[in-house]
Swiss-Prot record:
Keywords: ANK repeat, Cell cycle, Cytoplasm, Endoplasmic reticulum, Golgi apparatus, Membrane, Repeat, Transcription, Transcription regulation, Transferase, Ubl conjugation, Ubl conjugation pathway. Residues 574-909 form the HECT domain. It catalyses: S-ubiquitinyl-[E2 ubiquitin-conjugating enzyme]-L-cysteine + [acceptor protein]-L-lysine = [E2 ubiquitin-conjugating enzyme]-L-cysteine + N(6)-ubiquitinyl-[acceptor protein]-L-lysine. The gene is HACE1. ANK repeats lie at residues 23-55, 64-93, 97-126, 130-159, 163-192, 196-226, 228-253. GO terms for biological process: Golgi organization; membrane fusion; protein K48-linked ubiquitination; protein ubiquitination; regulation of cell migration; ubiquitin-dependent protein catabolic process. This is E3 ubiquitin-protein ligase HACE1. It is found in: Golgi apparatus, Golgi stack membrane; Cytoplasm; Endoplasmic reticulum.
Amino acid sequence: MERAMEQLNRLTRSLRRARTVELPDDNETAVYTLMPMVMADQHRSVSELLSNSKFDVNYAFGRVKRSLLHIAANCGSVECLVLLLKKGANPNYQDISGCTPLHLAARNGQKKCMSKLLEYSADVNICNNEGLTAIHWLAVNGRTELLHDLVQHVSDVDVEDAMGQTALHVACQNGHKTTVQCLLDSGADINRPNVSGATPLYFACSHGQRDTAQILLLRGAKYLSDKNGVTPLDLCVQGGYGETCEVLIQYHPRLFQTIIQMTQNEDLRENMLRQVLEHLSQQSESQYLKILTSLAEVATTNGHKLLSISSNYDAQMKSLLRIVRIFCHVFRIGPSSPSNGIDMGYNGNKTPRSQVFKPLELLWHSLDEWLVLIATELMKNKKDSTDITSILLKQKGQDQDGTSIPPFEPPGPGSYENLSTGTGESKPDVLGGKQEASADCQDVISMTANRLSAVIQAFYMCCSCQMPPGMTSPRFIEFVCKHDEVLKCFVNRNPKIIFDHFHFLLECPELMSRFMHIIKAQPFKDRCEWFYEHLHSGQPDSDMVHRPVNENDILLVHRDSIFRSSCEVVSKANCAKLKQGIAVRFHGEEGMGQGVVREWFDILSNEIVNPDYALFTQSADGTTFQPNSNSSVNPDHLNYFRFAGQILGLALNHRQLVNIYFTRSFYKHILGIPVNYQDVASIDPEYAKNLQWILDNDISDLGLELTFSVETDVFGAMEEVPLKPGGGSILVTQNNKAEYVQLVTELRMTRAIQPQINAFLQGFHMFIPPSLIQLFDEYELELLLSGMPEIDVSDWIKNTEYTSGYEREDPVIQWFWEVVEDITPEERVLLLQFVTGSSRVPHGGFANIMGGSGLQNFTIAAVPYTPNLLPTSSTCINMLKLPEYPSKEILKDRLLVALHCGSYGYTMA
């Protein structure tokens, strides 16, 4: 009866408290009953359960083998913690990682738990498996108030973890100022190194902790490197911590020059150095001028080293340009002051800011004299010999006994007389054209061109940084004009110099024209790389389409009105952000990424030429499109043309191909290339043939009675449009017919669609600068925008006709098709362009190729062979005039020469 009553009472208590009132007999089950109560600090319930239980309060459970005392300390359950301590819980019991309850209380800032643990003799000096004590945890988290209480119980405040780091190390690294002061006040060793030799100051600088570094330096911390020689300053510069560098320089002024010298270290990230020097230069005008003057001096020294032929060109070139880039960056962002702004130092102003360029004048003087010297020798060779292809520098490599002769050093200021006398064993003799080159002679241009060009690049950068954006320094223009012949000699010898060092051409149209013929002769691939290098210069992420985007930057468009909705969102979007990356999402869809962007461009490229918008009309061959001169039927046509330009500019910027092809004349408009009468064939082949006929024949006695005016249909009414002022009264004659043809071409191909072209270019140039796109011709621009079309050679052969003596089985024809199979896809496209004027095959294949009068098969006509004769073409009738070459090798050579030399144009069959 008594036992039954006891069970009834237990049942009643359990139901009232909604929990068990007795612990299970085994510790494993019991501990999981108690743990949630301990975490909630339900000390009465825990006390009641423990009162009649044999539960071991030090029982370790779980994967990390912690006791309930660990749980209480970790959660801040102070009442349960005291209860467990009174029940005999061990305050120094370590879990599997070596942590005691005191470690956990310190890590989580549980002050009351820490105090109670210390009352019950918790050992503050116990280290966990990583060597960390409770004091380390307080230092890591900056719990200064708790640290004050704990250090009173610590026997050694400099106790080390497994890496030899003390609490002071970690407090400095995490920037906890009051914690650092508390540890120092408690006797922490301010210069104690860890196992790698890193001091607390080193740790503070590694994370740019300016305030803790200042506290350490104020208290006498030594400036020491680690065992690998890495200094606190090295760490500050590597992280771009300008404020911390400023503190170091305040206490160690000698470090200023160390930072300046670091600009020569190519292992340091340039943008980090810029950040540091930018911060330092903002502190005062005098500091700003000091930095610039020091950088100018270092640049001058490096520049003269670069001009030394015995130096390592690659290393010195990179060093000079790196220093100059940093110099120019700092110059532009000087400290705020009433006089701050662009300082035209090269235009005669003698202000303090312009004077920072003075040390560089020594380098520019050496550059100028080098170029004058080479120009003099070029002139001498022109007079002395018909062979002026090289200037030779005689220099002995070794004497007969094997003794090395000192290498040639370029002249420094005041030493040019040695170069001209040629006296002394180690001094060079500049040979005239009449002297015979020996095996030990070197081409002076080959030896110096790259070096001098790199210095020219540095000179341009320094000139430009003093000019307002978009303006070219008059001094630099004068310099290029003065040395025009030598610079052209450089690039003729080594065209790569243009891509490596003559970047100024892209920013100076007045100079670009001098070198354009050389640039256009360079491989398409090299020009593409140069194009994108400068197009994306300064952008933070080269993987543009994949860069993370802000939700506000996503282009949200509707599929059912993709053209109009895209036009609206693109017009409102930030242009700079669109250059950096594109993110597109279709309304009501979740998908994003490159696939969606690709689909967006594909759909838009089809919509741009959708007849419903009346923006473009098909050309005569049915494969290309031309702006519609009557697009004004759409009230928003100019806005849409601007949008079309934006889309093509964006596609080119992000290397996304569009599924659309334009007429040659429209590509020319984009490039700024004048159109000619041959371009008329794309919209009116018969009229193009008539213009060709006028040019090819004498019209003096034909009585055509043409004037410099034409009749044009303007919305159903015929109007006479003069080709030039008073054109209606000016007769077309044999003498002025070429002008007439050009003017009528411009009317048909340009004037009639000028507003549309202007609107398109306005959008296109938002993303593609005119100076960059002019690197290409109209065929290459098509390739950039739309990619390489595929050509089915078997279909080509099947739909080819032969005339003037050729038949399908002739050896020359067999060789021709073998060559077509052998050449690259790019060269096949060139061949198709060469003969038909188009790079694409129309829908349905070669059977549907159009000529001047309708369908016209590709035709090969025989031409008598003469040595070096090139193939020609008549594009109006798709005819290749192929000489009867004696071998396949000669045929291939002559054909490729014709294709790559751009022998395009119309001839009459």
